[in-house]
Structure formats: C-alpha cells, structure tokens
UniProtKB/Swiss-Prot annotation:
This is Small ribosomal subunit protein uS15. The gene is rpsO. It comes from Sulfurimonas denitrificans (strain ATCC 33889 / DSM 1251) (Thiomicrospira denitrificans (strain ATCC 33889 / DSM 1251)). HAMAP family: Ribosomal_uS15_B. One of its GO terms (cellular component) is cytosolic small ribosomal subunit. SMART domains: Ribosomal_S15.
Length: 91
C-alpha cells in the first residue's frame, strides 16, 4: 500500500529538517508509521490477506530498527517524535 505523493510530501515537510529531507530518521519513521497504520486498517477488513500481513511485519521490523538507531543517536528528539506520532516507546 503505497502513499500518494501529496501525503508523503506533507509528512516530509512536517517531520523533515528541510523541504526535501527524505532521508532523516524522523521522516523515515513517520513514513513507515503511516504505511503501517494504513496496512493495519486494510488487514482489519481483509483478514485472510496473509501476504500483506507478512509485509506489515517487515515494515514493523524496519521501523523498530530505525527507532532503535534514532534513540541511541538523539534521545530527546526520539521521545518528541514518539509522542507526536502516538506510538509506544518499547525499544
């Protein structure tokens, strides 16, 4: 489930350090969080979509690794990002 370019640009401008900052950890975590929430809603409707479920697990693992790195790098910004995205700090 890909994000449309307008929604992706909105997330990049909200969480990025610059207008075209797509590589920073904050932006990557925010984009993954949006994709995870969209895929979770999809799986609530289509319960037997096992291929998408495996993709969801892959995205969650990727986000977990990025969050672990970001927490080590800048703990204050990490805590702010977690609060803003509304996700748990269980790393």
């Amino acid at each position: 489930m890909a994000l449309d370019s307008a929604k992706k640009q909105e997330i990049v401008t909200k969480f990025g350090r610059g207008e075209n900052d797509t590589g920073s950890s904050e932006v990557q975590i925010a984009l993954l969080t949006k994709r995870i929430s969209d895929l979770t809603e999809h799986l609530k409707v289509f319960k037997k979509d096992h291929a998408s479920r495996l993709g969801l697990l892959k995205l969650v693992g990727q986000r977990r690794r990025l969050m672990r790195y970001f927490k080590r790098k800048d703990k204050d910004a990490y805590l702010k990002l977690v609060a803003e995205l509304g996700i748990r700090d269980n790393i």
